[in-house]
Swiss-Prot record:
Entry keywords, A to Z: Nucleus
Sequence segments annotated as region (Disordered): 1-107
Lineage summary: Eukaryota, Metazoa, Chordata, Craniata, Vertebrata
Species the sequence originates in: Pan paniscus
Keyword Cell cycle: no
Compartment(s): Nucleus
Quaternary state and interactors: Interacts with ZNF202.
Name of the encoding gene: SCAND1
Principal location listed in the UniProt entry: nucleus
Domain SCAN box: start-end pairs: 108-166
UniProt-recorded name of the protein: SCAN domain-containing protein 1
Amino acid sequence: MAATEPILATTGSPAAVPPEKLEGTGSSSAPERNCVGSSLPEASPPAPEPSSPNAAVPEAIPTPRAAASAALELPLGPAPVSVAPQAEAEARSTPGPAGSRLGPETFRQRFRQFRYQDAAGPREAFRQLRELSRQWLRPDIRTKEQIVEMLVQEQLLAILPEAARARRIRRRTDVRITG
């Protein structure tokens, strides 16, 4: 559901829309209708508790309707590349603490440890996850088969018992996908 009003799209709340922007405003007791024609509840969403960290920013607590709307507006196709290829290459070749390049394991850990709280909303989380996955999987230099192999090996390591995992990790250090 894409909102045609820019105010609805950015806030996700009809309460933040000026009265002149809403259709059907007046003193009637009928529920208000948005531009799509669905009925909106008359009660406003509950105010955040003062003890919560988001109390100062009421827009930070998404309503179920706003969360569903934001999820539906996420791009399904490839996102436009906003980072210059040179900057992306520099991010991949940034030396680590020992002066060596960061390896795929470092980028894999960054991808797996990313949390939604680290982002400023679903679109930013999507963008960051996409960038972290590109840094880890390197689709510019690896084939689809190599990427699938990396994902399957990681999942296998996650489900193996501890003893088998230790043997597999020792074997894996001998055979690495370079890139």
